[in-house]
């Protein structure tokens, strides 16, 4: 992101200031930044250099779909990342996923080395026929994979509900609208991480309060 400056920012704000074992860091292998197998490892090494992290706790094949599956196999992603894990430069190997549940089932069947899947998962998309949040989650459970959640608040849409829907949650007196969305995602057994985009300090504090006293 930001022409690579996001990784430099992480280096200055996080990796250069705090002990490495005090935080967890993820990065991703993104199609569009390389075309051949020979370019994958240099791309990864540049990410490590820019962040100064030494290793990534979570390294993901980014935005996996049926369309991109063949490409990632052709460039050796499923060979190179496990080798990086054996070398200790990656701790956990997974992918973010954007496609149908049947595609996910095929990929996890063919690549059991994947440890986790990042899914778009929220109560609005749970039964959505395009996103298939529930079905994709159930595929992960079937294969014994942990799930990290993206879009738990659906780009902020579930943080500011329409008046009628918001009134129902407000009457419960259980916190912000966003907190209900986070708690929905976190309540599933195979979910081990919930990622929420935050643009203000207030949003960050609300999310931290929700997850620190989860109920």
Where are these regions (language model features)?
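Structural motif corresponding to the early beta-alpha repeats
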Residues: 16-38, 62
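Active-site beta-loop-alpha junctions enriched in small/polar residues
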Residues: 1-2, 28-32, 61-66, 96-100, ...
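Short catalytic-loop micro-motif centered on adjacent basic/acidic residues
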Residues: 1, 91-95, 193-195
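Short helix-capping segments at alpha-helix termini
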Residues: 16-22, 51-52, 84-90, 111-113, ...
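Conserved, mostly hydrophobic/aromatic
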Residues: 10, 25, 47, 56, ...
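Structured C-terminal cap/extension of enzyme domains
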Residues: 12-14, 83, 135-215
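Distinct, well-ordered alpha-helical segments
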Residues: 6-16, 37-48, 52, 69-79, ...
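Acidic, His- and aromatic-enriched active-site or binding-groove loops in soluble protein domains
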Residues: 81, 114-128, 173-175
């Amino acid at each position: 992101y930001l022409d690579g400056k996001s990784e430099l920012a992480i280096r200055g704000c996080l990796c250069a200031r705090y002990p490495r074992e005090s935080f967890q860091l993820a990065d991703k292998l993104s199609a569009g930044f390389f075309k051949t197998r020979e370019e994958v490892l240099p791309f990864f090494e540049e990410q490590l250099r820019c962040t100064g992290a030494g290793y990534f706790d979570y390294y993901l094949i980014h935005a996996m779909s049926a369309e991109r599956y063949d490409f990632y196999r052709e460039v050796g992603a499923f060979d190179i990342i496990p080798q990086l894990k054996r070398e200790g430069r990656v701790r956990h190997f997974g992918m973010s996923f954007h496609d149908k549940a049947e595609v996910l089932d095929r990929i996890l069947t063919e690549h059991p080395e994947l440890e986790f899947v990042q899914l778009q998962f929220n109560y609005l998309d749970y039964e959505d026929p395009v996103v298939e949040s529930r079905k994709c989650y159930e595929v992960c459970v079937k294969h014994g994979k942990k799930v990290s959640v993206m879009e738990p608040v659906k780009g902020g849409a579930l943080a500011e509900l329409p008046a009628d829907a918001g009134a129902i949650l407000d009457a419960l007196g259980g916190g912000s609208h966003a907190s209900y969305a986070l708690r929905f995602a976190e309540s599933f057994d195979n979910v081990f991480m919930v990622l929420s985009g935050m643009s203000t300090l207030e949003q960050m504090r609300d999310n931290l309060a929700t997850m620190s006293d989860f109920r």
